[in-house]
């Protein structure tokens, strides 16, 4: 992307002033190198978002931004319903509530050293993964509705976790306002056999070593030490979330026309928040969030069982679970006025700072854990939300590395077996269902996650706490 079109506010903040139909400016947080590497389509999509009714402050893009459907991935936009604000299915994405949860194992790298292969094999057997993968659960439609209403609370009630898990999950494991009746039967049927599955693409379960600590005091609060082993699970709402997105994108095209909304791009199909369609989508999307929370909770149960088989007595405790494809109602300041806003985060992680009431009590003095996944074979990070992030981008931060090339392009550069062998040579065990999928997710198909995290830290979006190195990766 050409940088000359932006006003450089600081080393890490780039602004494109509002012009034409834009109601607010575009603000991108990135180093100059990351900004230049972004596709021009990111700027175009961020500008289009800035034209939507009721948008507040700016159309934001995170350091890992790349172009997506309608909104850029890594985009953040907040809307005031009382100023004609809209909700957009494209602003949430197809994988509703895709997110990461990280578990502390109580084990160290030295303690698991001789059991890496048995652990990798046991996790591969225990965790259903891959395109169209099915789990060991089959939910009736009435049971599906209960899950969509209760989220991870349903899973815990069914014996797949503990109250402590809920306490350390975003929304305490249950998104209020879910309306299963707004989810199509087709979406529900797609999910009946998919609970407790990873799926494919960039989703994974990864056993990781805490390789480096950047902030000892917060790491101590989070219960992290160098050499510790943690497990991170990255997945979302599977087929149900995708179907909700598909269903409502079609409906919103019609709704936008009916409400006289002039859209700069059809992919930005949206509906006024104060409309029947806006309300219906929010109810369905919240049900999708609950599906993802329940799915990650069941995967946690399966992970605990697998660890217990190899390491009897292992006690895996949840650090945090946070999503990065959502639209949430939150209170934020806009020009000194406290407003109730609908914050779209698409490929962006909520990052509440110290003292925020939504942060679990155990972590409140430190700020919310912000879990950042790298690409396969590269490091991941644990960050903490900051107080200044609220004023920067509505308490939002990055979500991962961000793609540097398409999956199709990646297939022309790498073969799956080659990637698996290369990573094995570095001591990283890969267990996968598809060699094609491994090639599509090759490490160099993504941006440098360390550069992305450094930019987020330097800009004040979130604070670096710990660096995680992969040991075992289970992929679809």
Go through the PLM ranges and name each one.
Residues 76-104:
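Redox-cofactor-proximal catalytic regions of oxidoreductases
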Residues 63-64, 95:
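Acidic active-site catalytic centers that drive phospho-/nucleotidyl reactions
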Residues 101-105, 109-121:
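A glycine-rich phosphate/pyrophosphate-binding beta-strand-loop-alpha-helix module
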Residues 2-45, 55-61, 69-73, 81-89, ...:
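Domain-length cofactor-binding catalytic modules of enzymes
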């Amino acid at each position: 992307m050409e940088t000359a079109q932006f006003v450089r506010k600081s080393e890490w903040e780039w602004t494109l002033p509002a012009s034409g139909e834009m109601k607010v400016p575009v603000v991108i947080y990135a180093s100059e190198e990351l900004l230049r590497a972004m596709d021009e389509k990111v700027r175009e999509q961020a500008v289009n978002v800035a034209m939507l009714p009721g948008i507040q402050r700016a159309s934001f893009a995170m350091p890992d931004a790349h172009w997506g459907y309608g909104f850029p991935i890594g985009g953040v936009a907040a809307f005031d319903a009382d100023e004609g604000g809209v909700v957009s299915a494209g602003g949430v994405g197809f994988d509703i509530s895709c997110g990461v949860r990280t578990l502390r194992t109580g084990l160290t790298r030295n303690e698991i050293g001789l059991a890496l292969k048995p652990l990798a094999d046991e996790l591969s057997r225990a965790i259903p993964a891959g395109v169209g993968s099915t789990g060991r659960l089959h939910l009736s439609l009435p049971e599906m509705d209960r899950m969509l209403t209760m989220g991870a609370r349903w899973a815990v009630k069914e014996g797949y976790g503990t109250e402590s898990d809920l306490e350390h999950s975003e929304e305490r494991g249950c998104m209020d306002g879910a309306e299963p009746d707004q989810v199509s039967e087709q979406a529900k049927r797609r999910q009946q056999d998919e609970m407790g599955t990873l799926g494919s693409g960039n989703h994974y379960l990864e056993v990781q070593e805490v390789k480096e600590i950047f902030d000892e005091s917060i790491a101590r609060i989070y219960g992290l030490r160098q050499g510790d082993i943690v497990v991170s699970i990255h997945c979302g709402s599977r087929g149900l979330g995708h179907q909700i997105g598909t269903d409502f994108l079609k409906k919103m095209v019609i709704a936008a026309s009916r409400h006289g909304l002039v859209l700069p791009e059809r992919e930005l199909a949206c509906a006024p928040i104060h409309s029947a369609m806006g309300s219906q989508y929010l109810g369905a999307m919240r049900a999708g969030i609950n599906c993802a929370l329940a799915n990650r909770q069941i995967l946690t149960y399966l992970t605990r069982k697998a660890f217990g088989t190899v390491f009897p007595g292992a006690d895996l405790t949840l650090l945090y679970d946070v999503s990065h494809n959502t639209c949430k109602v939150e209170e934020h300041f806009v020009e000194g006025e406290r407003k109730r806003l609908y914050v779209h985060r698409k490929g962006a992680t909520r990052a509440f700072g110290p003292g925020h009431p939504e942060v679990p009590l155990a972590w409140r003095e430190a700020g919310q854990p912000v879990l950042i996944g790298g690409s396969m074979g590269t490091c991941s990070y644990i960050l903490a939300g900051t107080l200044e992030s609220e004023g920067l981008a509505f308490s939002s931060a990055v979500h991962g590395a961000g793609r540097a090339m398409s999956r199709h392009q990646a297939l022309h550069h790498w073969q799956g077996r080659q990637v698996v062998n290369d990573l094995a040579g570095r001591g990283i065990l890969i267990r996968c269902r598809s060699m094609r999928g491994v090639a599509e997710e090759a490490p160099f198909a993504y941006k440098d996650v360390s550069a992305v995290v450094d930019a987020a830290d330097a800009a004040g979006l979130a604070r670096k706490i710990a660096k995680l190195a992969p040991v075992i990766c289970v992929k679809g």
